[in-house]
Curated annotation (Swiss-Prot):
A Pfam family reported for this protein in Swiss-Prot or TrEMBL: Cytidylate_kin
Organism placement in taxonomy: Bacteria, Pseudomonadati, Bacteroidota, Bacteroidia, Bacteroidales
Organism: Bacteroides thetaiotaomicron (strain ATCC 29148 / DSM 2079 / JCM 5827 / CCUG 10774 / NCTC 10582 / VPI-5482 / E50)
UniProt protein name: Cytidylate kinase
Keyword Ribonucleoprotein attributed: no
Keywords per UniProt: ATP-binding, Cytoplasm, Kinase, Nucleotide-binding, Transferase
UniProt xrefs under HAMAP family: Cytidyl_kinase_type1 (MF_00238)
Sequence intervals crossing the membrane: none
GO MF, one annotated term: CMP kinase activity
Gene: cmk
Length: 229
């Protein structure tokens, strides 16, 4: 069976990572969370004084980005990969609201996207990968054999994020999360470099009212169709 590249793009908190991880595990592919890479750069920026309030010291980050290396290693307890920033596990740190509120302006910077896209393309050279993000099917792997674009209503996505934070024992109000979701949608769709959009050849999946099992079944079906071609 031929190996392919699978690109899953879509809005924040619409379950891209969960479905990408599950699909990768099911078909024996490597999963790469591109969103986690931008979150890791954001965390680095927060921890290294690159933010002054909401203002980014772009010159300082431009100098630092050359030495920022993001990798993924399997976590035997979860069965899924954790994110490492320069060799340090930051999986839990990058999922906080503090990082969520600052990740969109960081990921909108052209030199940050250029650096991350280069790392992502290096990871996917041999195919056999599932990568999710905002511009995987349009910019990172425009020739991916299977492209999915995922969407859901802002309210449903905010509720999912709220439930996820609550399960991890982290605080956050639903209203604050909903506002963050809407802000990120706007920034992601209107940035100058690689804005969020559905690739012309991507399949659309609105999972507002789908269970995880229904999603899995649909994704498996699409994967099967492509690898048999």
């Amino acid at each position: 069976m031929k190996k392919i590249t699978i690109a899953i793009d879509g809005f924040s908190s619409c379950g891209k990572s969960t479905m990408a991880k599950d699909l990768a595990r099911e078909v024996g592919y490597i999963y790469i969370d591109s969103g986690a890479m931008y979150r890791a750069v954001t965390l680095y920026s927060i921890e290294n004084g690159i933010f002054n309030g909401d203002v980014i010291d772009t010159e300082k980050l431009k100098e630092a980005i050359r030495d920022i290396r993001i990798t993924f290693r399997p976590n035997p307890e979860t069965g899924r990969p954790d994110t490492y920033l320069n060799g340090v596990n930051v999986e839990n740190k990058i999922r906080t609201m503090g990082v969520s509120s600052k990740v969109s302006p960081i990921s909108a910077l052209d030199f940050v996207r250029e650096a991350m896209v280069a790392q992502q393309q290096a990871m996917g050279k041999e195919k056999g990968i599932v990568m999710d993000g905002r511009d995987i099917g349009t910019t990172v792997f425009p020739d991916a054999e299977l492209k999915i674009f995922v969407t859901a209503t802002p309210e449903i996505r905010a509720q999912r994020r709220f439930d996820e934070l609550k399960a991890k024992g982290q605080e956050g109000s639903f209203e604050e999360i909903l506002e963050n979701v809407k802000q990120r949608d706007y920034i992601d769709q209107h940035r100058e470099v690689s804005p969020l959009r559905k690739a012309d050849d991507a399949l659309l999946l609105d999972n507002s009212n789908l269970s995880i099992e229904q999603q899995k079944e649909w994704l498996s079906e699409q994967f099967g169709k492509v690898v048999k071609e």
